[in-house]
Amino acid sequence: MTDSTPAKPKQHRTVFFVSDGTAITAETLGHSLLSQFPQVEFDMRILPYVDNEASAFDAVGIINQAAHDDDLRPLVFDTLVDPAVRDIINTASACNLDVFEGILSKVSAELGVPAEPIVGSSHGMVDSQDYKSRIDAVHFALDNDDGARTRQYDMADIILIGVSRSGKTPTCIYMALQFGIRAANYPITEDDLDDNRLPKVLKEYRHKLFGLMIDPERLVAIRNERKAGSRYASFQQCQMELRAIQGIYISEGIPSLNISEMSIEEIATRVIQTKGLKRRIG
């Protein structure tokens, strides 16, 4: 007999990333921790530039509203430096998680000098060159998303390829934001797969290519969020595309990675490591 017990519904929890800067650090560390709990569905929200008491009180109002709406305490990851601002955030009806709590004191004790926190410094914004590298990389990723501008590929550090909805765009944006890497991406379409070879525009950049793979069941779920019940989202279509693109990766000697059970952070790290990419920041 088969087990007819219905699957237990996922727990839902709202999460806030609160920062006196861009919230990139809080979000990155928070994502890494939350990825360990796949049985929970997280609604993630960013509250950046909470750098004074007025904005802190506004943030508390938003957090408390979420607690009321969900009838559950949200999780709050923060990288706040100003004690007065942090104290206000800690009054919210939430599980407050100071990302740096306990870490700075241990580092200070080891180094024998006190920490001198600077608002925004945890996000790399105090270094103008890092800031410029980050912004330039993000602009590049956006301009070269989804095969939009192939003429800039000579400037790319990496070109991610894969079927539609296989994680190319978020990975490119993440690498740009976190590491200043100029990442482009190109979707391999059904027409390309029918030809069973790389699109002509990619051939001269083969050394920059990295392929993303995904399990067909996962791809079906993602595509159904966009076009439910369509041929595009059918298992047969997804399986056909993935088998075809795997053949291209093998025949063209393109390194690839199955990202089905991986977080964006893990995908980016593996891509960087495999291709030996140089991080401009971080």
Regions found by a protein language model. Give the residues of each.
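Hydrophobic alpha-helical segments and helix pairs
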Residues: 96-146
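A glycine- and Lys/Arg-enriched "phosphate-lid" helix/loop adjacent to the NTP-binding pocket
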Residues: 125, 205-241
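Internal active-site segments that recognize and position negatively charged phosphoryl groups
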Residues: 135-182
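Short beta-strand-centered segment that lines the nucleotide-binding/catalytic pocket of NTP-utilizing
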Residues: 183-194
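NTP-dependent small-molecule kinase module
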Residues: 248-282
